[in-house]
Amino acid sequence: SIKFCKRRHFNYLFDFLSFDTIMTEMKIKVSHEVPIKLLEASRQFNDYDYCLVHLLDQKPEYKHYYKYAKVYDREVLLDNSIFELGKAFDSKEFAKKVEEIEPTYYIIPDSLQNAYETLTNFNNFTKEYTNLPGLKIGVVQGRTWNELFQCYQYISESADYVAISFDYDYYLTTGESTTNDKLEFWCSGRQRFIDQLIDRGVFRFDKPHHLLGCSLAREFKHYVDIPAIRSVD
């Protein structure tokens, strides 16, 4: 669900306008969050369908769209809605929704910036639900380099797909900004984190990666030579 904050500066407008050009050149799959009325039309501009689990029972037309997306040969990524809810959707209910929607991929319930709880949830979920349809996406979580590094190592070994978020607090320390802007810290912070994984020799070039959200579209030019970064929402 690509979201851009309103800014007075021209460079932010340029950032937005250049987004489609950047992503077309890189071949990263993109899905924008859209109003329900535009879901059908979104097939024309979204490379895949990104489904928020907490909306499935709130909006019948929302559920209908995603339940029948495969008729149109669409990839569907089912999110556990942790960003929207502040905590992951109940694991048992989430598994039921996976069985109902039959997504191409689904994000296993995680815990915001908590590596231990995320890995515990991942292990419990994968042991409890062994025959769900679709590929498993594990999210990297943590507050420090060591936590994020260790979580990445485990998730990249155990999940089918690795997700890295755009707004870890860690980025506010490692990122750079000429204007003390949080968006710039997040943008450069995730770039640096991925560079660190590559420099340490642990980045899995043989496994697809998903970028959860973004702050500034300029970030993605940094990944032009990293085809393992496959998608963004």
Label for each model-derived stretch:
Residues 23-131:
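Non-catalytic, usually N-terminal nucleic-acid engagement modules in DNA/RNA processing proteins
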Residues 23-41, 95, 107, 127-131, ...:
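Alpha/beta catalytic cores of nucleotide-metabolism and tRNA/nucleoside-modifying enzymes
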Residues 10-13, 17:
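Short hydrophobic targeting helices and cationic amphipathic motifs
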Residues 79, 138, 223:
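Conserved, mostly hydrophobic/aromatic
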Residues 18-22:
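Short, positively charged and aromatic/hydrophobic N-terminal segments
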Residues 112, 141-212, 216-218:
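Glycine/Thr-rich beta-alpha phosphate-binding loop at enzyme active sites
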